[in-house]
């Protein structure tokens, strides 16, 4: 039955997550692998995050300015930008871009390890494959996605500033003062970082679980990669709603 299968999969995913946490022992090998994964899934995601952030800022500024000028409230443009970015758009869009760039890579790598019997080889050598191959990827995602969200916000606000002030003619002081007065460090920026850490961990766990349990074939790896991106993206959107409902009451 579909319900039984879904419940079984959910239970396996929960046990897999506990295994990842249990295997997160900060040994020298673990820290070395963690550093490599931070570079692979974090630093290499910077270009797409930077470009995405800049163009989201430009689009928000353009559409927001047109809407606000209708009501004579163009001075509130940076308020709209800051609150929408930090509270919702930046964490979610960064996570979705991260899933497309790094989540698919994690699922494909682990699926290929399954297809080429590398996971079995680790088990035969009495090495926990989850601790070796999954835990560093999980913690790398938890650490890097908040940093990527910060980059996304910085580029979005910078691009918005240049468009609003130098193209649309908004006053420089008004832009920055409205942004400073509307965005709270803990309530807005802190929530963005919290969301990003949760989204990063969710993306890594889903991609790792699906890739780790993929069919040991090339087709199975392809299916697992697609499933990882879809499932992780849906969970990020669901968790974002739940967190927003809890944190912004």
PLM regions and their residue ranges:
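Membrane-interfacial helix-loop-helix connectors in multipass membrane proteins
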Residues: 63-86, 154-197, 201, 205-224, ...
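Short cytoplasmic-facing helical segments at TM-TM junctions of multi-pass membrane proteins
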Residues: 110-135, 218-221
């Amino acid at each position: 039955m579909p319900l039984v299968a879904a419940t079984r999969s959910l239970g396996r995913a929960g046990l897999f997550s506990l295994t990842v946490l249990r295997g997160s022992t900060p040994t020298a090998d673990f820290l070395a692998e963690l550093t490599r994964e931070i570079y692979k899934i974090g630093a290499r995601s910077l270009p797409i995050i930077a470009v995405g952030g800049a163009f989201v800022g430009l689009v928000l500024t353009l559409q927001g300015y047109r809407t606000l000028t209708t009501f004579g409230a163009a001075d509130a443009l940076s308020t709209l930008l800051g609150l929408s970015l930090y509270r919702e758009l930046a964490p979610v869009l960064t996570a979705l871009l991260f899933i497309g760039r790094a989540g698919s890579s994690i699922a494909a790598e682990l699926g290929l390890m399954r297809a080429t019997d590398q996971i079995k080889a680790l088990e035969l050598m009495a090495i926990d494959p989850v601790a070796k191959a999954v835990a560093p990827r999980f913690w790398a995602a938890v650490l890097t996605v908040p940093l990527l969200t910060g980059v996304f916000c910085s580029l979005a606000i910078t691009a918005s500033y240049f468009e609003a002030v130098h193209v649309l003619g908004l006053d420089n002081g008004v832009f920055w003062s409205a942004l400073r007065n509307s965005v709270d460090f803990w309530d807005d920026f802190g929530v963005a970082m919290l969301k990003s850490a949760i989204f990063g961990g969710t993306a890594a766990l889903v991609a790792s679980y699906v890739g780790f349990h993929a069919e040991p074939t090339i087709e199975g790896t392809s299916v697992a990669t697609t499933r990882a991106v879809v499932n992780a993206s849906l969970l990020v959107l669901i968790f974002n709603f739940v967190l927003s409902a809890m944190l912004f009451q």
